[in-house]
Swiss-Prot record:
EC number(s) recorded for this UniProt protein: 5.3.1.6
GO MF term set: ribose-5-phosphate isomerase activity
Residues engaged in binding substrate: T28, G29, S30, T31, D81, G82, A83, D84, K94, G95, G96, G97, K121
InterPro entries cross-referenced by the UniProt entry: NagB/RpiA_transferase-like (IPR037171), Ribose5P_isomerase_typA_subgr (IPR020672), Ribose5P_isomerase_type_A (IPR004788)
Name of a matching Pfam family: Rib_5-P_isom_A
Pathway the protein acts in: Carbohydrate degradation; pentose phosphate pathway; D-ribose 5-phosphate from D-ribulose 5-phosphate (non-oxidative stage): step 1/1
UniProt-listed HAMAP family: Rib_5P_isom_A
Record-given protein name: Ribose-5-phosphate isomerase A
Amino acid sequence: MTQDEMKKAAGWAALKYVEVDSIVGVGTGSTVNHFIDALATMKHNIKGAVSSSVASTEKMKALGIDVFDLNEVSELSIYVDGADEINAHMDMIKGGGAALTREKIVAAVADKFICIVDNTKQVDVLGQFPLPVEVIPMARSYVARELVKLGGDPVYRQGVITDNGNVILDVYNLKILNPKALETQINAIVGVVTNGLFANRGADILLMGTPDGVKTSTN
């Protein structure tokens, strides 16, 4: 099984958690694109979706899935999204695609967070993948200095503007032993919109594509 085939298996496995007549929270990324393809097969049985990015919105609309603004929706039963890293406690690093803030907002609304990944994303300790931090542009240098104080090496992601008009700092060389505490600490830096640690709101269900099929874990 190739990596993409494992992603596809995980994406399609999430379809069984979609309820008839519901609005589905949909994330962003290569694994989520497989879920969107799967979701399109039952588009007539759901009300539609809420999207975490312009890219996912465009893909769903092209496939005929109705997309709602989150402000129109008071509840979501599930949010389906991928991760750049996930540990045994279902804490995650997300934001490689720069959609972390909207992803975190939609995840906060949903009753259940279903994380879909291939087995290369599972780690013992978070931090090998650089931690994305979304920053108000004028605060970039200040936030970078504060992140250095935390032991990280922040790098400005050149040429990337988020859907919210902000910039991304990717923080390297963090060994994240307490994800919840670090998520809170970084978010308290003035000028930070949010960071890519999803620990205070981690995943509830993990669907991991492996060479032996999709493995399911619950939190």
